[in-house]
UniProtKB/Swiss-Prot annotation:
Example GO molecular function: translation initiation factor activity
Quaternary organization: Component of the 30S ribosomal translation pre-initiation complex which assembles on the 30S ribosome in the order IF-2 and IF-3, IF-1 and N-formylmethionyl-tRNA(fMet); mRNA recruitment can occur at any time during PIC assembly.
Keywords from the named record: Cytoplasm, Initiation factor, Protein biosynthesis, RNA-binding, rRNA-binding
Domain S1-like positions: 1-72
Record InterPro entries: NA-bd_OB-fold, RNA-binding_domain_S1_IF1, S1_domain, TIF_IF1
Role played: One of the essential components for the initiation of protein synthesis. Stabilizes the binding of IF-2 and IF-3 on the 30S subunit to which N-formylmethionyl-tRNA(fMet) subsequently binds. Helps modulate mRNA selection, yielding the 30S pre-initiation complex (PIC). Upon addition of the 50S ribosomal subunit IF-1, IF-2 and IF-3 are released leaving the mature 70S translation initiation complex.
Taxonomic lineage of the native organism: Bacteria, Bacillati, Cyanobacteriota, Cyanophyceae, Synechococcales
Domain of life: Bacteria
Organism: Synechococcus sp. (strain JA-2-3B'a(2-13)) (Cyanobacteria bacterium Yellowstone B-Prime)
Family recorded in the similarity comment: Belongs to the IF-1 family.
Any one GO cellular component localisation term in the record: cytosol
Compartment(s) where it occurs, according to its Swiss-Prot or TrEMBL record: Cytoplasm
Protein name, UniProt field: Translation initiation factor IF-1
Amino acid sequence: MSKEDAIEMEGVVTESLPNAMFRVDLDNGFNVLAHISGKIRRNYIKILPGDRVKVELSPYDLNKGRITYRLKKK
């Protein structure tokens, strides 16, 4: 799968799970299990429940995703 194939959506982190996994409620109402991308991990960006994030979903499995960006708080 190339980067162009990924589906990018926004959502809110609802739960923090072990091994840097998070449960994210997407804006369209779906609930996905997401892990942190390497750039977020390398730059020590903390993600907490309640944060708005961008999630990349694979077109093959829409229940799992990768958190690629934490959006700024308003």
